[in-house]
């Protein structure tokens, strides 16, 4: 059994008890999240929503907050003595699929 869910602006293929990393949802550690289900597959039966399935739901549990790799940016203008650098680390959350129903 697996489902395609939409979390934020991204889609993920998930199955029961799977742990995955996604962008931060704004929920606290230990809380549960219910997501929009786009596709639900159970052995040979496949249900496709347009755009989402109304009766299906996937429950996720927030395990921990973490950060992605650091990305470095650099801007430079020749002969003007102008240099600017910056860095960014994306806020992420580790999520576990608790249940898939529908």
From Swiss-Prot:
Keyword Flavoprotein belongs to the record: no
An annotated GO cellular component: cytoplasm
GO molecular function: rRNA binding; structural constituent of ribosome
Keywords from the named record: Ribonucleoprotein, Ribosomal protein, RNA-binding, rRNA-binding
GO BP field: translation
Tagged with keyword RNA-binding: yes
Matching InterPro entries: bL21-like (IPR028909), bL21-like_sf (IPR036164), Ribosomal_bL21 (IPR001787)
Pfam short name (any one): Ribosomal_L21p
PANTHER family named among the record's database cross-references: 50S RIBOSOMAL PROTEIN L21, LARGE RIBOSOMAL SUBUNIT PROTEIN BL21M
UniProt family annotation: Belongs to the bacterial ribosomal protein bL21 family.
Entry-linked HAMAP family: Ribosomal_bL21
Complex and partners: Part of the 50S ribosomal subunit. Contacts protein L20.
Function as written in the Swiss-Prot or TrEMBL entry: This protein binds to 23S rRNA in the presence of protein L20.
Name listed for the protein in its UniProt record: Large ribosomal subunit protein bL21
Organism: Leptospira biflexa serovar Patoc (strain Patoc 1 / ATCC 23582 / Paris)
């Amino acid at each position: 059994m697996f489902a395609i869910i939409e979390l934020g602006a991204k889609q993920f293929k998930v199955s029961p008890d799977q742990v995955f990393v996604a962008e931060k949802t704004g929920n606290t550690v230990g809380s549960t999240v219910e997501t929009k289900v786009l596709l639900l597959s159970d052995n040979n039966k496949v249900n496709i929503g347009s755009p989402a399935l109304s009766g299906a739901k996937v429950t996720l549990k927030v395990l921990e907050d973490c950060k992605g790799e650091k990305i470095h940016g650099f801007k430079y203008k020749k002969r003007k003595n102008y240099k600017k650098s910056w860095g960014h680390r994306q806020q992420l959350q580790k999520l576990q699929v608790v249940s898939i129903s529908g």
